Amino acid sequence: MKGYMEDREHEKSLQAEKEELKEVSVSYGHEVKLSNLFPTRFGHKNYQHTFEGMDHGRHVHAHGNKMQQLADVFFFRDALRPGSVITPTIPPTTSLPAFLPRHVADAIPFSADRFADVLAMFAPASLAMAREIRWALDTCGQRAAALLPGEKAGCATSLESLADLAASLLGTRDVRAFSAADLPTDAATTPARRGRYNVTSVRELSAMAGSGSSSSSEPAPAAVVACHDLTYPYAVFYCHSTKPTAAYAVTLVAATTGDGDGEGEAASPAKMEALAVCHLDTSRWRADNPFFVAHGVKPGEVSVCHFLTKLSIVWVPRHEQGGPRAAA
């Protein structure tokens, strides 16, 4: 996804467009101005960018502490066993704007080519809001060009289109959806959640889907679709599916009590039910991924996992749900 090095010329362009659109009002058949309907989430750091390291096809523009933060997002798959101790990084969740009805969402422009029209609908738009809107539009419109082989992706702007997209990516409408609904909802300025936790149970959501190729007796991992909420004036999700991938429901119990693991970090709940996704084939990831650099490993040598946010959704075919994972 987007790097940490901001393009100053792009910022100037956004600022110019924002100035031009301050007094613009666009009607799309609704009496109520859309900018009055939705709470905004643009006054705080967008923790979607914490997962820059998950966009494995691009160079990571980060240095020093930022590189360490990206490295901390990931962990080895072996840690997902009862009895292990883990220090998860789970980006905070504030709130998700409401989904629009499908007929309304489909009538609203949603593309980088219509960026000026989109901004006009939410005028007056701050520069931060304009940047996040543009980033979401670019993610949904241009991300396909940077997909890894075998990866599929798309964006959904309504609840109905979200279900349809997941079914399309999985190739079946008989699906199950999982989310970490019990994770806390945080204040807008809350940093990433950290803390030492005991892994007490791990349940695989994506079972092995039959046998593998004719040349191997190993089972082939089932399809998994992960959907991540984007910062936007109304609910928008970016969904993608990459094989081979495994998804887990993980119960975490605090190994220590009190505040966060470091200065300014969120207080650690005593217990969390979280979702984790593991990428089983990292051979096509960049060698400069912060996790690889921090641990001295190369692409393809290890499976890499990360936790999902409260609002992220994991979809799997209904008949492929797995069971508990054994302790080491």
UniProtKB/Swiss-Prot annotation:
Residues 74-318 form the BURP domain. It holds the Pfam family BURP. Expressed in roots. This is BURP domain-containing protein 11. It comes from Oryza sativa subsp. japonica.
